[in-house]
């Protein structure tokens, strides 16, 4: 598995529905980029300029919401992931 560096987190994005409740099929180019995902890897924490270590706010398995244009999509061993900075995560789902 990939291990994120710095203050980065690796997510597996939620897939968008292929059709609406009314049964209308949505074209791939009309779909919005998903803004939620499951945390699959986190860093060990980041170090501030004064040397203080800050532990990550999220843990593996958390369902999170993130900024719309955050992160970089990567493919690794046939799967798609999103690598983003922890600051781009806006909420953890209960």
UniProtKB/Swiss-Prot annotation:
GO biological process: chaperone cofactor-dependent protein refolding
Listed SUPFAM superfamilies: GroES-like (SSF50129)
Keyword line: Chaperone, Cytoplasm
Classification via InterPro entries: Chaperonin_GroES, Chaperonin_GroES_sf, Chaprnonin_Cpn10_CS, GroES-like_sf
A cellular-component GO term for this protein: cytoplasm
Localisation: Cytoplasm
Gene3D superfamilies per the UniProt record, alphabetical: GroES chaperonin
Superkingdom in the source lineage: Bacteria
Keyword Nucleotide-binding: no
GO molecular function: ATP binding; metal ion binding; protein folding chaperone; protein-folding chaperone binding; unfolded protein binding
Principal location listed in the UniProt entry: cytoplasm
Membership in a protein family: Belongs to the GroES chaperonin family.
NCBIfam families attached to this UniProt entry: PRK00364.2-2, PRK00364.2-4, PRK00364.2-5
UniProt subunit comment: Heptamer of 7 subunits arranged in a ring. Interacts with the chaperonin GroEL.
Function, in words: Together with the chaperonin GroEL, plays an essential role in assisting protein folding. The GroEL-GroES system forms a nano-cage that allows encapsulation of the non-native substrate proteins and provides a physical environment optimized to promote and accelerate protein folding. GroES binds to the apical surface of the GroEL ring, thereby capping the opening of the GroEL channel.
HAMAP family on file: CH10
Identification of the protein by name: Co-chaperonin GroES
Organism annotation: Lactiplantibacillus plantarum (strain ATCC BAA-793 / NCIMB 8826 / WCFS1)
Gene that this sequence comes from: groES
